[in-house]
Structure formats: C-alpha cells, structure tokens
Swiss-Prot record:
GO CC entries: cytoplasm; plasma membrane
Job description of the protein: Oxidative deamination of D-amino acids.
Taxonomic superkingdom: Bacteria
Required cofactor(s): FAD
Designated name of the protein: D-amino acid dehydrogenase
Species name: Pseudomonas syringae pv. tomato (strain ATCC BAA-871 / DC3000)
Molecular function as annotated in GO: D-amino-acid dehydrogenase activity
Catalytic activity: a D-alpha-amino acid + A + H2O = a 2-oxocarboxylate + AH2 + NH4(+)
Enzyme category, top tier: oxidoreductase
Pfam families membership: DAO (PF01266)
InterPro entries given in the database record: DadA, FAD-dep_OxRdtase, FAD/NAD-bd_sf
C-alpha cells in the first residue's frame, strides 16, 4: 500500500519513518531542498513533556494585555486582513477556562509522554545521534510571585505523576553551575529531571537517512498545489502540475495545512505563531548551560547543544510574515547575556524565525479526516519536537488499523465539528509503559 506524505519537517519525517517500519511504501514530498528546513530548522531544542501545556489557560487574556505593554514582550499581535486570524484568536479565548484547560492539557501530556518514550526507544534501537541530552529542564523564576504561582503547576505535575524538584538558589547553582554568579536575581526554580534536549533539525536529517534505508523516497524542491477528491476519497495531489496518486495521504504541512484542506470543506484551525531563535557558539563551556533553562519572565528557552547555545521563544500572531525583527534579536541577546554573560560569543550568533502551527486548544491534530484516505499530523505548536515520534507512531498505527499504545481520543479533527463518518476508531492497547 502506497502512502504519500506531504511535508518533510520533523512531523512528516517521523510519520514516514514509522509508516515504513509498518510495511508501507512511502513517498515524502516537500518544496524545500532538504528535510527540516522550516519550523524544525532552529527551534528551541526542548523535548519537554513536563511542560506540555496549552497557551490557552485561565488568566492568559489578562497576562496578554500586560505582555503587550512590555518592551521585551513574549507576545506581539500584528493585525492582518485575514479573517482566520481573528477566528483563531476567538477560539483560543474560548479555551481559556479551567475546564477546557484541564481537558486540553491531559491530551497534550498523554501524547508528549508517549512521544518521549518512543524517542527513547528509537535512540536505543538505532543509535541515532542528534546532540541529545537527558539532563532535565529548569524553569527560572525571577520573582517570588512567579515562584508562588508554580504551586498550580506542581499540583498538575503531581496529579500526572511527573517527577520534579523545587530549587532554591543553591539548588539552581547545583544543577546549572554557570548560573552561580547570577542567582541573586532569581527567587527559585522548578526542575523536571526527565525532560530532554536535542537538535531537532539534525535528528530529522538523520532519521530521514534511516527512512531511506527502509525504502522511503524523499522528493525535494516540488510544489504541492492542491488535493483532488471525489466523494469521500482523495483521488490525488497536484504537484508541479502533475496529479500524483496513492492509497493513503498524510498532510504534515504545519501552518500551511489549512490551505489545502479548505477547498475540501475541512476546517482545520491551525494558525502560525511566529517564533525566533538565536544560535550562539559556546566560548566558555564551563559558563554555558548544562541542559535547558526556561526564563519564566520572558517565556524564552536557553538550550545547550554540544558546542552551541540555542535561545528561542516569543510568539507573534502576524500571519505568514517571515521577516526578522531586530527588536526580537535584541531581546534574545539581552536574556542570554543576563544569565550566561560569559557562555557564548554573541557577535557570531545566527538569527532565525519560524512559524509554529498552533491550534486554539494547544492539542495537535493527529488522525483521520472525513475523507477516508486522508490523514492529518499537524498543529503541534511549540511542541513539535516533543511530540514528533509519538505522533508519527500513533498515525502509522491508525493508518495500519493497528491498536495504538495510547488512546487517540480527542486528537483528531472531529473535536472541531468535522464529521468523522469514515474514521477508523481503534481501541488503544494497554497503557504504554
């Protein structure tokens, strides 16, 4: 059975890999010259199931107003003429209730923890190397109020059985020695020891090589134009003026997925949240991060690779604008310079931006659609790297009609009101260990 995967970011590539392992004949098509060249290229580098939470949360609307008034704001909104921007923001606001937050977070944590386990298994089985570290994530609080508010997050962690440590200043210096000289500006920290880090683009590149060894064909530099359908079935994809056909189709085009779905009558509320990153060569390894740091004040992650520091964050609701805003670079340089003033050479840093495909409820869209042979794997927001392996494996199981290892409930597009008359509902296997 032939499967055509549209998109070769970390989501499309993991989908292709697990489909090939399941015995499918897989072809991946992308407009870029290689895998992982868009949103997967220079993200923050975190694999953080413990921090899998929707942006839509109680209190966020008020926080957003305050953020918009700050010079180094983690959020910016640029009005466009696109009605989808306003519809998406309205849907997100409707999800900022305690009940919806709890439902959405459970879905995200379920998939994220499974995905981390799949990544661990993949690393053991294949030896794939991607500058990965399994040294946890440390969330820094600059104020006592932030530290006090962490009690709500800790309650959720305890309920989910996620290990954690609450650190004082001495504890921060113990797990991140390079911060010893700046602990005076910190009130405390929350550490999740089971979180991981790694270069997402490097992982995607090497997994694609392994997929090729399994028979996957990658076709680059090809423009995906539109999907053709007849009744409840996709009959082909127009690629550079040629109609390509397969038995099953997987749409993994991130923020661009809705553009192909809309003509089919499928509404996918996936909207781009623009993020930025700075990649800094390490000048003094002893003064660089050990793993990943999250700065709660600025909503920025600072991650250690082998010889580089990746500083990533921000959220701009600005449509598909990919221009580089120098003020965002200034903010990232300020934060890394504040915490790790001797760690890296900012004069040699590279600046990047990407579009995170985000749903209003934070949960990605993974699974079947109203069209019987079309499947989606998109909308992972800031957690594409965290959720990639689990999403790819879950999707492959669903397409193969195999019993998945976790429940797929609430993950497909039917939660937005799209009918699922032809979706295959498969009971999950016993809880994944």
């Amino acid at each position: 059975m032939r499967v055509l995967v549209l998109g070769s970011g970390v989501i499309g590539t993991t989908s292709a890999y697990y489909l090939a392992r399941a015995g499918f004949q897989v072809t991946v098509v992308d407009r870029q010259p290689a895998v992982g060249m868009e949103t997967s290229f220079a993200n923050a580098g975190q694999v953080s199931p413990g921090y899998a939470s929707p942006w839509a949360a109680p209190g966020v609307p008020l926080k957003a107003i305050k953020w918009l008034l700050q010079r180094h704001s983690p959020l910016a909104i640029k009005a466009t003429a696109d009605i989808d921007q306003y519809l998406w923001m309205a849907q997100m606001l409707r999800n900022c209730t305690a009940n919806r937050y709890a439902v959405n977070k459970e879905r995200m944590v379920r998939l994220s923890e499974y995905s981390r386990d799949c990544l661990d298994e993949l690393r053991i089985e294949t030896g794939i190397a991607y500058e990965g570290r399994s040294l946890g994530t440390t969330q820094l609080f600059r104020t006592q109020a932030q530290l006090d508010n962490a009690a709500k997050d800790i309650a959720v962690l305890e309920q989910s059985g996620v290990p954690y440590e609450l650190l004082d200043r001495a504890g921060i210096a113990r797990v991140e020695p390079a911060l010893a000289g700046v602990t005076g500006i910190l009130s405390g920290a929350l550490r999740l020891p089971n979180d991981q880090t790694g270069d997402c683009q490097l992982f995607t590149t090497r997994l694609a090589q392994m997929a090729v060894e399994l028979g996957v064909e990658f076709r680059y530099g090809q423009n995906i134009e539109r999907l053709e359908h007849a009744g409840d079935t996709v009959s082909g994809v127009w690629i550079d003026g040629v109609l390509e056909t397969a038995d099953r189709y997987v749409l993994a085009l991130g923020s661009y997925s809705p553009q192909l779905l809309k003509p089919l009558g499928i509404k996918a509320p996936v909207y781009p949240l623009k993020g930025y990153s700075l990649t800094v060569p390490i000048s003094n390894p002893a003064m660089a991060p050990t793993s990943t740091i999250l700065d709660e004040t600025y909503k920025v992650a600072i991650t250690r690779f082998d010889n580089r520091i990746r500083v990533g964050g921000m959220a701009e609701i600005a449509g598909f604008d990919l221009s580089l805003n120098p003020r965002r670079r200034e903010t990232l340089e300020m934060i890394v310079g504040d915490l790790y003033p001797q760690g890296g050479d900012l004069s040699q840093a590279s600046f990047w931006t990407g579009l995170r495909p985000t749903t209003p409820d934070g949960t990605p869209i993974v699974g079947a659609t109203p069209l019987r042979n079309l499947f989606l794997n998109t909308g992972h927001g800031t957690l594409g790297w965290t959720m990639a392996c689990g999403s790819g494996r879950l999707l492959a199981d669903l397409i193969a009609r195999k019993r998945p290892q976790i429940s797929a409930a609430g993950l497909d597009i039917s939660r937005y009101g799209n009918p699922q008359e032809n979706a295959q509902h498969v009971n999950p296997a016993p809880a994944h260990q």
